[in-house]
A protein has these predicted regions:
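Membrane-embedded beta-strand positions in outer-membrane beta-barrel channels/transporters
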Residues: 35-37, 88-90, 128-132, 175-179, ...
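Outer-membrane beta-barrel "beta-signal"
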Residues: 248-261
Length: 261
């Protein structure tokens, strides 16, 4: 258990923990988590938010204890650890420019676990800037309406240099989500075609699933009947990037059925 959290560069194709004892895991406390938020809406209808939270990691980090043997590091025990007291602070805004809703957020995670060059999780500080927006188009020749959402991001590990981490100390990318809407195609039936594309342009930060050159493309078809029944199918393809892209084999088909009453 837990091998998926070891980067491929650390575990390699031949890495295994067979015969290595698992020691007692370090679970997170059930208490000590809290958060606060403050919002201010200006006269121009711009929403400005300030947030702060303290929480515990919801996914385990794998810690391996090594000993030197004939000049080689040999694993002698391992455990899963849930890091506590991760602090998050963020400032955000939401406004309207022309006919486009624009949002932005600058967030900083302090003492979040990240894998260093030894393969061990260490507490680091991660800053992330996100700018995005949503624009709605009216009827066209090939649709009744279109909603386009977009977002760009830049992340930087502010507390560590690239040489101290198993991957890079930065990452950047963008994503676009477009939904084509078709009204009353059949009596009582509306349809939509959701299309999602994500491209990690540069840099690798595995903890936020950003892999340089990696791409995700998802195309689906959804149907709605009288606002009660919904059915949909979508195919998602993961491609691009090099062997650091741990998501490259995750292609899948998703089928959803939903009824509201």
């Amino acid at each position: 258990p837990g091998l998926a959290f070891i980067p491929e560069e650390i575990r390699g194709n031949e890495f295994n923990l067979f015969g290595v004892p698992r020691t007692r895991d370090e679970d997170a406390s059930d208490s000590g988590q809290w958060g606060a938020a403050f919002h201010y809406v200006t006269e121009g209808n711009t929403d400005i938010g300030v947030y702060h939270a303290v929480g515990h990691d919801k996914k385990p980090s794998l810690e391996i204890t090594y000993e030197e043997l004939f000049g080689q590091r040999i694993p002698v025990s391992y455990r899963q650890r849930y890091f506590e007291d991760i602090r998050g602070t963020a400032v955000s805004f939401t406004t309207v420019i022309g006919e486009t809703n624009v949002t932005g957020e600058l967030s900083i995670l302090e003492d979040t676990p990240m894998v260093d060059t030894s393969g061990d999780p260490q507490r680091e500080d991660l800053a992330k800037l996100q700018i995005g927006g949503t624009h709605v188009l009216g009827p066209g020749a090939f649709w009744d309406d279109v909603t386009v959402s977009f977002e760009g991001f830049y992340a930087n590990v502010t507390s560590a240099a690239e040489r101290d981490l198993i991957a890079d100390d930065y990452a950047m990318g963008y994503s676009v989500f477009t939904t084509l809407g078709y009204k009353n195609v059949f009596p009582g039936w509306d349809f939509e075609v959701p299309i999602f594309f994500k491209h990690d342009v540069s840099g690798v930060i595995q903890e936020i699933q950003a892999y340089s050159g990696a791409k995700v493309l998802s195309v689906g078809l959804g149907g709605f009947y009288l606002n009660n029944f919904r059915a949909g199918i979508a195919y998602s393809a993961y491609f691009g990037g090099d062997r650091k892209n741990l998501l490259r084999d995750r292609d899948h088909i998703a089928v959803t059925l939903k009824y509201s009453f």
